[in-house]
Amino acid sequence: MANTIEIRKGESGWGGPLSINVTAGKKIVYITAGTKPAIVDHLVALTGWEAVDGFKQGEPPAEEIGVAVIDCGGTLRCGLYPKRRIPTINIHATGKSGPLAQFITEDIYVSGVRVADIRVANDAEAAPPEVAVADVAVNAGKGTGRDYDTSKKITEQSDGLLAKVGMGMGSAVAILFQSGRETIDTVLKTILPFMAFVSALIGIIMASGLGDFIAHGLTPLANSPVGLVTLALICSFPLLSPFLGPGAVIAQVIGVLVGVQIGQGTIPPHLALPALFAINAQAACDFIPVGLSLANARQETVRVGVPAVLVGRFITGAPTVLLAWAASSFIYH
């Protein structure tokens, strides 16, 4: 077992390198779709830490997490662990992006990592450089400017009503300005690139002929209430829903294909609403571990809450489709 491991960014990756001291009792949390990434097994071999599946076993307490492994493409999960100052490894080459991008820094986050990018580091290399702060602290207490007497009439401080109103308005304007700046930043860095990606993906599928192939397969399912219920059960199946949910990409692609078929008259228009519920039956299933972590839920809550939500979506998916079908029958007839 190594004393310190060094993790460098992979090809086209960002951040790092991370130097992690191996401390007994820590755990490796991985929240990834599909099978366990190979780097998790490599980290277990180097550190001797226990690997914990965040989807199935829930997240351990923050003080027990030695490193977090994710597969985020630029959404909220990228910054979830860096915000809590937990070393984060992203197997995707995702940089500083997402709603929590301000917390993603090179000293706590590294992306595009492969097995070859993780190695044992010498203690001398891993030791962080000591910064001489004594002189800085001493110099910080010495002001170079002049001290002015604020007891004079012209310069004395006022805490009257007008001053309080001015300070309150200034604070409100600052908050609104910051919120607007963060909103624009999120739109430019997260929402617009994602919209462009989905649009390009749909265009490729439609132009390549793959869309027609998928549409022919979906038409029998989307052409009747029973077929839509079957589609909802497939999308919300607990073993599939966490992998179908990220970014709602699959739901958007299928929605476009179904919409084209409705426009062509292949699928009756009154089935549009139940079809919408059917293809979104898996909504939020991929976000449950992240949401519970943001809420600082206990480990027992995460362990019980994740499967409960997955099974709950599976149970409620079909009834919502039937309710939508009943409602749409009154709308279009």
Swiss-Prot record:
Catalytic residues identified in the record: 72
Listed InterPro entries: PTS_EIIBC_GUT_C, PTS_EIIBC_GUT_N, PTS_sorb_EIIBC
Induction context: Activated by sorbitol and repressed by glucose.
Membrane-topology annotation of the record: Multi-pass membrane protein
Domain of life: Bacteria
Coiled coil: none
GO biological process, one term: phosphoenolpyruvate-dependent sugar phosphotransferase system
GO CC terms of this entry: plasma membrane
Modification sites for Phosphocysteine: 72
Chief localisation class: membrane
Enzyme Commission designation: 2.7.1.198
Keywords: Cell inner membrane, Cell membrane, Kinase, Membrane, Phosphoprotein, Phosphotransferase system, Sugar transport, Transferase, Transmembrane, Transmembrane helix, Transport, Virulence
Catalysed reaction, written as an equation: D-sorbitol(out) + N(pros)-phospho-L-histidyl-[protein] = D-sorbitol 6-phosphate(in) + L-histidyl-[protein]
Domain PTS EIIB type-5: 1-192
Transmembrane helix found in the keyword field: yes
Subcellular location: Cell inner membrane
Pfam families named among the record's database cross-references: EIIBC-GUT_C, EIIBC-GUT_N
Any GO molecular function: kinase activity
Segments passing through the bilayer: 191-211, 220-240, 243-263, 271-291, 304-324
Protein purpose: The phosphoenolpyruvate-dependent sugar phosphotransferase system (sugar PTS), a major carbohydrate active transport system, catalyzes the phosphorylation of incoming sugar substrates concomitantly with their translocation across the cell membrane. The enzyme II complex composed of SrlA, SrlB and SrlE is involved in glucitol/sorbitol transport.
Domain remark text: The EIIB domain is phosphorylated by phospho-EIIA on a cysteinyl or histidyl residue, depending on the transported sugar. Then, it transfers the phosphoryl group to the sugar substrate concomitantly with the sugar uptake processed by the EIIC domain.
UniProt xrefs under PANTHER family: PTHR39427, PTS SYSTEM GLUCITOL_SORBITOL-SPECIFIC EIIB COMPONENT
Protein name per Swiss-Prot or TrEMBL: PTS system glucitol/sorbitol-specific EIIB component
Organism: Erwinia amylovora
